[in-house]
Every structure is written in C-alpha cells, then in structure tokens.
C-alpha cells in the first residue's frame, strides 16, 4: 500500500507545481503586457491594439496586372472552333495574294534554260517581249537562233536530255595522233642525220690523219729485186744455144 501511494503523491506534486507556474505566468502577463508581446508568444496586453501588417513596395509595376489575370480553363480557340475558321481564311487570303508560280523552259542559242517557281505574270510579260522582237536580222551580222519561250502554267514539260558528244571528241583526238604517227619517220631521219654529222666532226677533230682513203696521196711501190733468187726483174736471162 505504501508503494502504491507514493507515485500518486509524486503526480500530485507535479500537478500543483504546474498549476502554480501557470498562475505566476498569467499574473506576470497581466502586469507587464508589453513585455509579453515582445517575447513573440502571441499574447497581447490589456488595451493594446492589433498591429497592422507592414506594407510592401512593388518594384515591378506590371507584376500586379499579371497576377490579376485569370486562367481560362475552357478556351474557345482549342479544338474545332472559330480560331480554325480564322486560320483557314487567312491562309486563303495569302494564297490569293501570292502569284502563281510554275516551271519555265526557254530554248535560245542552242541551249535549254529551265527556271523553277517562275511567276505567271512575269512569264506572260516575257512572252510578249519575245513576240515583239524584230524578225529581220542585219545583213552583216549572222542571224541568231530564234528564242522560243514556253509557258508551263498548264502542264509541266519534260526537259530534253543533252546529246552526248563523246564520239566526236574521240574522232578529234585520233586525228592529231595519226598526224604525229606519220611525222615520226621524218623526225627520226632528221635526228639520225644530225647525229652522224656530229660524229663525223668528232672523228675529224680527234684523228690527225685524213679519214677518207680517196684524199690520201698514192704510194708508189718499187719493184722488188731479189738477186739471190734470180727471179727478180733485174735478172739477166741468157738464151739457150742449141747444138747443131
């Protein structure tokens, strides 16, 4: 019993001490209301008016108007509505204002000129200018090829493929090759002739004697005399006498 009564007594002492602390705090607040407000406990003194919130100065003038704008949760421009009709009308007006453009092909001087996205009004003006050209050419100057302007506003026209001039170029390249082949023997003969002349000059300069045997003086050969054989030209032939 004594053990069970002890905790109860301790709890009672704590309750009385807490109640005394609260009573002392309330008395202090009543006596010093301004000091309690400065503590930041949210307790106002007697006769004290509530303080107004400090006014803030906006440095951005357009910020207030932007905050006032309300968000439109159901915009009319979304989906198929009036905005689509306005967009279609503006696109149609833009197409009407923009001139029609097609492909233009011009044949002049043996050349084919193709222009893409050429305005129709400019094509008509160009055709009128070509039709006003003088058909009579000057006598001294060569007559240029007539210009042919075709307007492709109705249907596109296929551009003719250029004709290849490869066989003509090969024939022109073979002509000088053949001419050089015919000139090669003559050139070789001329170079061989020059080489022989230079060689002859070098031989004449190196050898002290005359090269050609026709220019040399003939040497006279003396008849050989060999008396010891008795068959030479100086030998005396004695006639043989026959006995009667």
UniProtKB/Swiss-Prot annotation:
Interacts with BHLH148. Interacts with COI1A and COI1B in a coronatine-dependent manner. Coronatine is an analog of jasmonoyl isoleucine (JA-Ile). PANTHER family: PROTEIN TIFY 10B, PROTEIN TIFY 4A-RELATED-RELATED. Residues 194-204 have a biased composition (Basic and acidic residues). One of its GO terms (cellular component) is nucleus. The keyword Nucleus applies. Residues 174-244 are annotated as: Disordered. Its main location: nucleus. A motif (Nuclear localization signal) lies at residues 187-194. This is Protein TIFY 10b. InterPro entries: CCT_CS (IPR018467), TIFY/JAZ (IPR040390), Tify_dom (IPR010399). The lineage of its organism: Eukaryota, Viridiplantae, Streptophyta, Embryophyta, Tracheophyta. It comes from the Eukaryota. Belongs to the TIFY/JAZ family. It comes from Oryza sativa subsp. japonica (Rice). One of its GO terms (biological process) is regulation of defense response. The gene is TIFY10B.
């Amino acid at each position: 019993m004594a053990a069970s009564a002890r905790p109860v007594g301790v709890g009672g002492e704590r309750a009385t001490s807490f109640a005394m602390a609260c009573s002392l705090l309330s008395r202090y607040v009543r006596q010093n209301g301004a000091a309690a407000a400065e503590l930041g406990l949210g307790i106002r003194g007697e006769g004290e008016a509530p303080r107004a919130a400090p006014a803030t100065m906006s440095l951005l003038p357009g910020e207030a108007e932007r905050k006032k704008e309300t968000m439109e949760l159901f915009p009319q421009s979304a989906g198929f509505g009036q905005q689509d009709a306005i967009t279609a009308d503006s696109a149609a007006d833009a197409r009407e204002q923009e001139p029609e453009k097609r492909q233009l092909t011009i044949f002049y001087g043996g050349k084919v000129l193709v222009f893409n996205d050429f305005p129709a009004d400019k094509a008509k003006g160009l055709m009128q200018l070509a039709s006003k050209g003088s058909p009579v050419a000057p006598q001294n100057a060569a007559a240029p090829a007539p210009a042919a302007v075709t307007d492709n506003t109705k249907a596109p026209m296929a551009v003719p493929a250029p004709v290849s001039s490869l066989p003509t170029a090969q024939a022109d390249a073979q002509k000088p090759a053949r001419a050089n082949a015919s000139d090669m023997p003559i050139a070789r003969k001329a170079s061989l002739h020059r080489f022989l002349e230079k060689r002859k000059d070098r031989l004449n300069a190196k050898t002290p004697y005359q090269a050609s045997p026709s220019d040399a003086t003939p040497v006279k050969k003396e008849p050989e005399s060999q008396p010891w054989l008795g068959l030479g030209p100086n030998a005396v032939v004695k006639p043989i006498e026959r006995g009667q």
